[in-house]
């Protein structure tokens, strides 16, 4: 139950003798909560000086009252939940060009992942183009995109290399660059 919560708030469960419940008159049951059993009052009393002699204490009941430690209360789950999937870690490119990374599980290197004995081998990494991660695109997807955009009717498509040279002013104008200038 919530015995540990009641103790944290300063309450304890007190049992009253049956004759004390009858001394309050016929309307005493109206003030009782619906879960109170025979011989129990409201069940919760603020801690204070005990009215009678203290009950005998047991060694394990000091922190939890007469009920002992809560058996069903666990602050953390005993068993971690099963993982939704298995993640495969792959080594990353070296942070500094020209310097090789230490192999996994080597001294000074990162600890490598330990695959499960029944797990299949991870798929090979995608090929990188120009040192950047690239995702290969299916030829059928490109063909359907070409048809959808109407590019199949165009005889010659301009080459687009954004970020490398958006415009080359000297090749467009057909003249040589002035001496001592830097080309775009």
Curated annotation (Swiss-Prot):
Cytoplasm as UniProt keyword: yes
Top-rank lineage group of the source organism: Eukaryota
Pro residues bias spans: 104-126
GO cellular component: cytoplasm; nucleoplasm; nucleus
Signal sequence range: none
Pfam families: CITED (PF04487)
Entry keywords, A to Z: Activator, Cytoplasm, Nucleus, Transcription, Transcription regulation
Annotated region described as Disordered, given as residue ranges: 18-67, 94-128
Localisation: Nucleus; Cytoplasm
Membrane-spanning parts: none
Tissue expression remark: Expressed in most tissues examined with highest levels of expression in heart, liver, skeletal muscle and pancreas. Also expressed in bladder cell line ECV-304 and in various breast cancer cell lines. Also detected in both in situ and invasive breast tumors where its expression is down-regulated and mostly restricted to the cytoplasm of malignant epithelium. Down-regulation of expression is associated with elevated levels of HIF1A and increased tumor growth and angiogenesis.
Compositionally biased residues, Low complexity: 18-28
Family that this chain belongs to: Belongs to the CITED family.
Biological role stated in the UniProt entry: Acts as a transcriptional coactivator for TFAP2/AP-2. Enhances estrogen-dependent transactivation mediated by estrogen receptors. May function as an inhibitor of transactivation by HIF1A by disrupting HIF1A interaction with CREBBP. May be involved in regulation of gene expression during development and differentiation of blood cells, endothelial cells and mammary epithelial cells.
Subunit structure: Interacts via its C-terminal region with the CH1 domain of CREBBP and EP300. Interacts with all TFAP2/AP-2 isoforms.
Annotated protein name in UniProt: Cbp/p300-interacting transactivator 4
UniProt gene name: CITED4
């Amino acid at each position: 139950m919530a015995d540990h919560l009641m103790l944290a708030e300063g309450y304890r469960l007190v049992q009253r003798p049956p004759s004390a419940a009858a001394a309050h008159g016929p309307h005493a049951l109206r003030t009782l909560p619906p879960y109170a059993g025979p011989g129990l009052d409201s069940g919760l009393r603020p801690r204070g000086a005990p009215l009678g002699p203290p009950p005998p204490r047991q060694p394990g009941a000091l922190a939890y009252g007469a009920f002992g430690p809560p058996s069903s209360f666990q602050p953390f789950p005993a068993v971690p939940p099963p993982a939704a999937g298995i993640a495969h870690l792959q080594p990353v490119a070296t942070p500094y060009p020209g310097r090789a990374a230490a192999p996994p599980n080597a001294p000074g290197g990162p600890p490598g992942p330990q695959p499960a004995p029944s797990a299949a081998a991870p798929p090979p990494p995608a090929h990188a183009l120009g040192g950047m991660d690239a995702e290969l695109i299916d030829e059928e997807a490109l063909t359907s995109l070409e048809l959808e955009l109407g590019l199949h009717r165009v005889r010659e498509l301009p080459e687009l290399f954004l970020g490398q040279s958006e415009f080359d002013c000297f090749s467009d104008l057909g003249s040589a660059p002035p001496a001592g200038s830097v080309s775009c």
